[in-house]
Amino acid sequence: MITTKELRNKFINYFESKNHSHQPSSSLIPFGDDTLLFTNAGMVQFKDVFLGIEKKDFSRAVTVQKCLRAGGKHNDLDNVGYTARHHTFFEMLGNFSFGDYFKKEAISFAWEFLTKEIKLPVEKLWVTIYASDDEAFDVWHKHIGLAKERIIRIDSSDNFWSMGDTGPCGPCTEIFYDHGEDVAGGLPGTPEQDGDRYIEIWNIVFMQYNRHADGSTTDLPKPSVDTGMGLERISAVLQNVHSNYEIDLFQALIKKAQQVTHAKDINSPSLKVIADHIRACAFLIADGVLPANEGRGYVLRRIIRRAIRHGNKVGAKEIFFYKLVAELVSQMGEAYSQLIDKRELIEKTLIKEEELFLKTIENGIKIFDAEIENLKDNTISGEVAFKLYDTYGFPFDLTADMAREKGLKVDEQAFLAQMQIQKQRSKEAGKFNVDYNSLINSQVKSEFRGYSTLIEDAKVLEIYQDGQLVASTSEQVSAVVVLDKTPFYAESGGQVGDKGILEGIGFEFVVEDVQKSGEAILHIGKLVKGRLNLNDELTARVSDKPRLATAANHSATHLLHKALKLVLGGHAEQKGSLVDENRLRFDFTHDKAISRSEIEQIELLVNQQIRANYPVTTIETSQQKAKSLGAEALFGEKYGDIVRVISMGDFSIELCGGTHVAYTGDIGLFKVTSEGSIASGVRRIEAVTADKAIRHTFTNENKIIAIKDSLKANDTNLIDKIKSMLEQIKNQEKQIAKLKKELLSGSSNDIKETNIGDIKVVVANVDGVDVKTLRNKIDDYKSKNTKVIAVLTTTNADKVQFVIGVSNALTTLIKAGDIAKELSSHIDGKGGGRADMAQGGGNNSANIDQALSQVEKFILNNIKE
């Protein structure tokens, strides 16, 4: 039996023998493509190559691509574990031609691999083609020799692929494997095609047309090929099993899942869910995603929590999910070294997330059970699903899973509506960003000269004004200018674009920002003098002070990154950065606040490297060579075949396209200004360098001097004086609280109490106390009376504050939250809470006595009913 590992290697080796360049899998996070949540196909990393935006030094490629379908349009999550072939994470085998070979070669390669390399029986294979693709038919029938009746023409979108509404598109041919007569299902194109007998194993897309906005198509000058074959699916065929979950890789994970959950039934769908989900979670974390309540992090959290729920369902009594990582590394670590490199981070993240979830799941399940008891039909409302998500951290899928097990469904549309309301509520006004890619012809190329010079003579290639290509621009008009060569650095890798001027005979253009679009460098700014025309010769001059300050901050981020790893551990991976002339901001993975001692160690390490005055050296080399040198590749960055390696002594080696100082000593001084959390498992450090670091130190020293002067203290006794003052404040606050309690006790004689049968009703206003004191008094009433309803208010100027308590035994008669609403309506206020306790406030204290009288009537009417 051929193993999954052997099949993966066999595919790569076969296409390498056919002169294909083996390219590593790209990240599950698509670079620079906001249209995709996750990489879901092998062609994603080559999208710009197919579009003609990006050029490669090879025209044939082979990949084994990590893919994920668990969010957005491509979402298989609900089916995972319950069908034979649905997965969140999967591996896509693919071979690609970029204007090289076409239909004859692509079909021949696929047929040879299937029938000769892995020896599938010819009689088990069927193919489909697009109905009008006679060329593909001829290749299959005349060149391959496949019988006509085994070639099925399909006149639908199943056999025609497009990248979008416009752009490259073309027909497909698909190869199917026949599992035999004992499996239900019919041939593709028949009413029974959805059965499992005939399974698609390879899809070959012929990109030969360009679709225009009006729907018409024209031939592409260089047709290309994009193919995909699921590794899990073809492994199942070769291992003679019907379900992907029966292949060697999944069986190892399922056995481990059974071991760590103590499940009794090895065939439980829950074990398949866990085996599938550990792959998705581990690879997402390795690619830099961490659990969160939105975006990709939310998808990861959903998958983790779904796996945990299924573990609990089959018997897991303790944290278990992270225990599958070791087996996953054993199965896939050889093919994906990132699993080995990031194993500690993966395990720590899963442990933390499972601990967090277990704290909330018990309460959430109680709420879920309580809600379904009161259901009038078989549908759980979207409001309840949202409450479980928002309050208890239940992903929608988990609520839907629990509902499905009880024969119920969830109103997903209403849930999504609630999500949209929340999103609108928290949405911040964002800046308007021009889509420069839509403005610039992708063939325009600018040469960057800014590593070695800040001044360059250049020629104007294009001018854009209000999104339109123009021949010239006039004074005081904003525009985008593209040059043939430039010293201006375009924003990239967290470093902001340069500022400066473009000047020539009779004109001056102020550059306010610089961006990239394909291979074009865009100078964005305003013409402040004269007139600028196409083909004008000019001098491009970068402002040196901002550039040098930015370079110092950028170099400091490299030193900081290394220092973080040394002080906090290797898991401290960069998650993002911002570098400009004023400061640096650095985001990294770490699951707790950094102590003052750790910050001091980090600052000390960075400043030691600055004082050492190491030369900052640059080499350009292959990615493989850079990796052998130990260079750090940063999350979220896309690197070319040749990369730029920045070294600072032996301390820091990173791939980087940014600008840097010549010596570490040029950074001057490094000082952390803030540290905090920006997301679950992600911390942010902000820092300053050089003169700004010195000024920051001066500012802090001046604050300390001002504090010493105010307290009449010196360096020796300052801390003791502050401690003494805080102790005095603490004692005085205790005394104030005591006096307020005595005041309330003294007022108790004036508080009106009414007894309705065995129910005590207390409604009163007490001046001169705070809400905490009122709350304590309410608790006192409830502890001394099994049936009490208490409403206490206090006023200060026009303001009213109130606390309401209802004994648990009475909440079926009247709820504290309902009383709060009634009181609020009389005092221009708002309030709410639980059935047994509520509080709030209002802006009209003038008629507090009348308001309390109305509230008392409201209470009496409710309890008498």
Curated annotation (Swiss-Prot):
Q: What GO molecular-function term can you cite, just one?
A: aminoacyl-tRNA deacylase activity
**HAMAP family given in the database record:** Ala_tRNA_synth_B
Write out the entry's keywords from A to Z. Aminoacyl-tRNA synthetase, ATP-binding, Cytoplasm, Ligase, Metal-binding, Nucleotide-binding, Protein biosynthesis, RNA-binding, tRNA-binding, Zinc
Organism of origin: Francisella tularensis subsp. tularensis (strain WY96-3418)
Catalytic activity of the protein: tRNA(Ala) + L-alanine + ATP = L-alanyl-tRNA(Ala) + AMP + diphosphate
Q: Name one Pfam family in it.
A: tRNA-synt_2c
* Superkingdom, taxonomy of origin: Bacteria
Cofactors demanded by this protein: Zn(2+)
Q: Which Gene3D superfamilies match?
A: 2.40.30.130, 3.10.310.40, 3.30.54.20, 6.10.250.550, Bira Bifunctional Protein, Domain 2, Threonyl-trna Synthetase, Chain A, domain 2
Q: Which residues does the record give as Zn(2+) binding sites?
A: H554, H558, C656, H660
Q: Which gene encodes it?
A: alaS
Q: Which NCBIfam families does the annotation name?
A: alaS
The Enzyme Commission number assigned here is 6.1.1.7
InterPro entries with a match to the protein in the record: aa-tRNA-synth_II/BPL/LPL, Ala-tRNA-lgiase_IIc, Ala-tRNA-ligase_IIc_anticod-bd, Ala-tRNA-synth_IIc_core, Ala-tRNA-synth_IIc_N, Ala-tRNA_ligase, Ala_tRNA_ligase_euk/bac, DHHA1_dom
Its family remark reads: Belongs to the class-II aminoacyl-tRNA synthetase family.
Report whether Signal shows up as a keyword of the record: no
- Heme keyword on record: no
Q: How is the cofactor bound?
A: Binds 1 zinc ion per subunit.
This chain belongs to the protein called Alanine--tRNA ligase
Subcellular localization, as worded in the UniProt entry: Cytoplasm
